[in-house]
């Protein structure tokens, strides 16, 4: 079993485990699969690359670049936020959200949740329980709000509200205009959970979010009223790790169906109105997944890449040659599925049969957060802070 991010009571750092021996007392060594040999059917091209601060190092993070109106916005853990020209990567503006700690130094802002761009603002959260709204024009701070806990997932903006899911199990709604807290919903917390939180999905005036308690919840966005809760993961098993029931992935809502995925639980389809389970499949992950047409694409907790049907979760294909390479969440780009890994490779996979179609060594520091796609470019940020724009 692979566990990448673990939150222990009183421990704020990220713990990387290669097995379960810490909890079971048994040696359980997990080895990374060797790099698969791939005959490239095309050569991906790096259009530009540029540094954004010092990156995230080995810390857990949800920071990844976002492109809006031909501008790329990216951040590092310490507090550097930059706007870049999407054509050539040149800097438009740069700010540092770290507090001054003397004449020539700043303390780290511990940015972790973001980046989200909407309505002329860049939204980003921190492990210091701060949420920032920056003006897209020049990076100046429009507002800054203290929230209930660490903001580890990206802010979600909808209907004039900024939704923040904090590390202590609180879902909070902030006024998009000034950051004032409108309401708080407690989603409950188990004694042990993975480090990270589900970013909410929004549909028909509701926020749908996963919790560390193994439940998916639907909440009215304007009132903060719970509509329904449904358990999709049960805390069972002989070890503490086996009993982790987190739903840290972002639910996907399509045609009145909520698709949700737990770490040790199930891939589950629920009715949006009632929360009733329509079907479930025994699969687990901490990576966000894709619903595209009648297919679901995901990376499971052992780094198998799978394609399944939206009707029942039937497996169409499985790619198992990247086991334990600590893959990013997948992204669809020009008809292929793309994932990054901890050694800095990008892997391009045929969506029809799961075969590799290309492989590219991009960065020596490796990747943790998922690529994003905009305006014909694939954007990805390495752990050392370098942002790459790639085309095929």
UniProtKB/Swiss-Prot annotation:
Annotated transmembrane regions: none
Gene Ontology BP, a term: Gram-negative-bacterium-type cell outer membrane assembly
Pfam families named among the record's database cross-references: PQQ_2
Entry GO terms, CC: cell outer membrane
Signal peptide: 1-19
InterPro entries: BamB, PQQ_b-propeller_rpt, PQQ_rpt_dom, Quinoprotein_ADH-like_sf, WD40/YVTN_repeat-like_dom_sf
Gene3D superfamilies in the cross-refs: YVTN repeat-like/Quinoprotein amine dehydrogenase (2.130.10.10)
Main location: membrane
UniProt keyword terms in alphabetical order: Cell outer membrane, Lipoprotein, Membrane, Palmitate, Signal
Lipid-conjugated positions (N-palmitoyl cysteine): 20
Lipidation feature positions (S-diacylglycerol cysteine): 20
Subcellular location: Cell outer membrane
Bilayer topology annotation: Lipid-anchor
NCBIfam families: assembly_YfgL, PRK11138.1
Assembly and interaction partners: Part of the Bam complex, which is composed of the outer membrane protein BamA, and four lipoproteins BamB, BamC, BamD and BamE.
Homology family: Belongs to the BamB family.
Function: Part of the outer membrane protein assembly complex, which is involved in assembly and insertion of beta-barrel proteins into the outer membrane.
Protein name: Outer membrane protein assembly factor BamB
Species for this entry: Salmonella typhimurium (strain LT2 / SGSC1412 / ATCC 700720)
């Amino acid at each position: 079993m692979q566990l990448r991010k673990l939150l222990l009571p009183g421990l704020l750092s990220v713990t990387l485990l290669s097995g379960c021996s810490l909890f079971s007392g048994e040696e359980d060594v997990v080895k990374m699969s060797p790099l698969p040999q791939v005959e490239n059917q095309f050569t991906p091209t790096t259009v530009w690359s540029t540094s954004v601060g010092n990156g995230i190092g080995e810390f857990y993070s949800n920071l990844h670049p976002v492109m809006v109106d031909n501008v790329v916005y990216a951040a590092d853990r310490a507090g550097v936020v930059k706007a870049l020209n999407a054509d050539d990567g040149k800097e438009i503006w740069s700010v540092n959200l770290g507090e001054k700690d003397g004449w020539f130094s700043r303390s780290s802002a511990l940015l972790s949740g973001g980046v989200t761009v909407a309505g002329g603002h860049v939204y980003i959260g921190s492990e210091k329980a701060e949420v920032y709204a920056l003006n897209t024009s020049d990076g100046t701070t429009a507002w800054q709000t203290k929230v209930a806990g660490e903001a580890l997932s990206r802010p979600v903006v909808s209907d004039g509200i900024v939704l923040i899911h904090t590390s202590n199990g609180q879902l909070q709604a902030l006024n998009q205009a000034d950051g004032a807290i409108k309401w708080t919903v407690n989603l409950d917390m188990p004694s042990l959970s993975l480090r990270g939180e589900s970013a909410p999905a929004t549909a028909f005036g509701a926020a749908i979010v996963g919790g560390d308690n193994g439940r998916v919840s639907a909440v009215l966005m304007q009132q903060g009223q719970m509509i329904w809760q449904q358990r999709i993961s049960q805390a069972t098993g002989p070890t503490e790790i086996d009993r982790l029931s987190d739903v840290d992935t972002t639910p996907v809502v399509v045609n009145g169906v909520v698709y949700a995925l737990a770490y040790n639980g199930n891939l589950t389809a629920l009715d949006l109105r009632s929360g009733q389970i329509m079907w479930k499949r025994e699969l687990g992950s901490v990576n966000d997944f894709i619903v595209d047409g009648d297919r679901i694409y995901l990376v499971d907790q052992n780094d198998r890449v799978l394609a399944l049907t939206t009707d029942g979760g039937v497996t169409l294909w499985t790619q198992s040659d990247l086991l334990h390479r600590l893959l990013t969440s997948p992204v669809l780009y020009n008809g292929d599925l793309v994932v990054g890994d901890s050694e800095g490779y990008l892997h391009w996979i045929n969506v029809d049969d799961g075969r590799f179609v290309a492989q590219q060594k991009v960065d020596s520091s490796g990747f943790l957060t998922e690529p994003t796609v905009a305006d014909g470019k694939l954007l990805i940020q390495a752990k050392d802070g370098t942002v790459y724009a790639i085309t095929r």
